[in-house]
Amino acid sequence: MEHVVPTYLSTKHHHPRDDDISFEEGPHIYTVCGDRGGFTSVTTWNHSHFAQFNADAIIDKMLKSPKMKDPTYKYYGKTKKQIKKMWDDKRDSSSTAGTKMHNDIEYYYNNEDVKNDSLEFSYFGNFIKDNSHLVPYRTEWMIYHEEMKLSGSIDM
């Protein structure tokens, strides 16, 4: 299901620079002042400063660990392929749940209907009750810097 970005707060608190920037989620490309892809996204810039996660190298090291002989160890008896699948499945389910939570909070603050009976969303409800003095200005705000040629999105 495609995420439809709610617009209540961005319309209410419109900024002239909002009209200069757009984002294509699939290829992760910003267009700024008509320049498509000429600005580096902050996400891309951040990733350039860290080594990519190397599951194979980490699992190879784990398989040599004495822990792998312990029947109580959660990876005991698992092959490299099985461990990698466990990690991939956990990554995917966590990402899906996190994205849903993020979107539901965004919908809530933009006066959209939200159907989420998860424990985590109830924690968000508690946060709202405990912090009723906080008033959202924007839930997402696309920004850019002309000289640095950086673009990104600030999320609440």
What are the functions of these language-model segments?
Residues 1-100:
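Charged, glycine-rich intrinsically disordered N-terminal tails and low-complexity linkers that flank
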Residues 2-12, 20, 27, 86-156:
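Catalytic cores of nuclease domains that cleave nucleic-acid phosphodiester backbones
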